[in-house]
Amino acid sequence: MNGIVNVLKPPGMSSHDVVDRIRRIFGVKKAGHTGTLDPGAAGVLVVCLGVATRLARFLLGEDKEYRVEITFGMSTSTGDSYGEITDQRDASFLKEHDIIRVLPEFTGEVRQVPPMTSAIKWRGKKLYELAREGLVVERQERAVYIKSLEFIRGSGWGTPSPRALMHLSCSKGTYVRSLCHDMGSRLGCGAHMSFLVRTRAGPFKIADSVTLEELQAAASKGVLERKIIEMDRAVSEYPEVIVKSSAVKAVAAGSKLYIPGVARMPLDLDCGKLVRLTGPDGLLAIAEAGREPFDKEKLFFKPVCVLARQAGRSSN
């Protein structure tokens, strides 16, 4: 089986465990997700099956959306509710307008220090592996982009640990727990991420996601294929270049596609632009537009991720 599954990851499972479960349900060897969710978090986990795993690197860069609950007045060792409390302060002074007032400071380009619980490597070891050993190392700030951060509602006003529910839209690589920690520091009371749900990853929305139980039930009924999303839909944001039947074999071999082999394409494609090459059997490849150095008028598309071989077999 080849394609994409939009899984609703439950809290309490690691992303790795979810992928293992998917492998067993679908009976495939190759499967991988396109962006980790913490074990305590829930929501959209995009899993690629079979040849679709080649598309994972193109989906990793997609923007994401979350619902996040922030608890003020308590900082933890991990930045979420699973760590030990490292600092506790009375945040009963906080009001809704205090939080709304600082939100513009956390939108646009924001500098973040990756948490020790992240998978970033430091001298060959992942940070979370070092954290398990009780080590803390210096990390460099990274720039991320927060498209929007909206206050939805709050609770516990006037208590030592009020909470706020937010909607977050952000770029890849954004550490939500770091955002919560930094907001708590800005407000002078500390904070941690107490709940997180990913509501969207690129084109995949939580409203369209399926649970592991639903997938297992579909497998029992023999209708598991209905839960698979076609590869072409996963990369539909890329401009489409339709390939003539006579040029499909060359694309499958990874050769450059020139205009004579194109049936239809958008106008004004710039060099370096990624496109999707499609043929009679669906998605053939992801390719990069370019021009020959000796003939700037000669446009071509160089495959950077070929899927055509599998597409050809599946059509028989």
From Swiss-Prot:
Its UniProt entry gives the catalysed reaction(s) as:
uridine(55) in tRNA = pseudouridine(55) in tRNA
Checking Pfam families in the record gives: TruB_C_2 (PF16198), TruB_N (PF01509)
The active site annotation covers D38
**E.C. code:** 5.4.99.25
- Where the record annotates domain PUA, the positions are 238-312
The terms under GO molecular function for this entry are: RNA binding; tRNA pseudouridine(55) synthase activity
Q: Which Gene3D superfamilies match?
A: Pseudouridine synthase, PUA domain
Task: Tell me one GO biological process term.
Answer: tRNA pseudouridine synthesis
Q: Which InterPro entries match?
A: PsdUridine_synth_cat_dom_sf, PsdUridine_synth_N, PUA-like_sf, PUA_sf, tRNA_psdUridine_synth_TruB, TruB_C
Source superkingdom = Bacteria
Enumerate the UniProt keywords alphabetically. Answer: Isomerase, tRNA processing
| Family, per entry | Belongs to the pseudouridine synthase TruB family. Type 1 subfamily.
Q: Which PANTHER family match?
A: PSEUDOURIDYLATE SYNTHASE TRUB1, TRNA-PSEUDOURIDINE SYNTHASE
| Known function | Responsible for synthesis of pseudouridine from uracil-55 in the psi GC loop of transfer RNAs.
HAMAP family on file: TruB_bact (MF_01080)
Protein name per the record: tRNA pseudouridine synthase B
